[in-house]
Regions:
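Acidic-basic catalytic patches of nuclease active cores, encompassing PD-(D/E)XK
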Residues: 1-37
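Conserved catalytic cores of phosphodiester-cleaving nucleases, focusing on short active-site segments
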Residues: 27, 46-72, 76, 84
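Hydrophobic residues on conserved beta-strands that form the core of alpha/beta folds
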Residues: 34-36, 58, 103
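Solvent-exposed beta-strand sheet faces enriched in polar/charged residues
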Residues: 38, 62, 104-106
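Short acidic/glycine-enriched loop/turn segments that link adjacent beta-strands
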Residues: 42-44
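Short, charged, amphipathic alpha-helix that recurs within catalytic cores of restriction-modification
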Residues: 75-94
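Domain-level recognition of nuclease-like catalytic cores that cleave nucleotide substrates
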Residues: 94-126
Length: 126
């Protein structure tokens, strides 16, 4: 997934930013084009906006230092899902995009070596 600086647990902001960079790299490796990051909407932020083929993906990135509080995917609950859908609608209204929009979650868990174990889930809410 590319070289990242060795990370330690206990620095959530740094860990989250590194996770978003790692997620963008993973998505590029899997054929997605990252077209936006950090879109601020009234109901929250879209971590990554990607395109693959004729589909736009709204990607939530969840980075964890361990699994003591559940998996990264489990952290995307009903409230976050509603916020993502509302932010996606706002993004569509402000952009020229008229094609299909789908959702994805990239879950990253910090490893003992300072890298990440990564999991990409498309359509996690279906």
């Amino acid at each position: 997934m590319g070289a990242l600086p060795r990370l330690r647990a206990g620095r959530p902001h740094e860990l989250g930013r590194a996770g978003e960079r790692a997620a963008a790299g993973l998505l590029r490796e899997r054929g997605y084009e990252v077209v936006g990051a950090g879109f601020l909407a009234r109901r929250g932020e879209l971590d990554l906006v990607c395109r693959r083929g004729d589909t736009l993906f709204i990607v939530e990135v969840k980075t964890r230092s361990g699994d003591a509080f559940g998996t990264p995917l489990e952290a995307v609950g009903p409230r976050k899902r509603l916020a993502m859908r509302a932010a996606a609608a706002e993004y569509r209204a402000l952009s020229e995009w008229r094609g299909p929009i789908r959702f994805a979650v990239v879950g990253l868990t910090l490893t003992a070596e300072g890298g990440f174990d990564a999991e990409l889930t498309e359509d996690p809410f279906d």
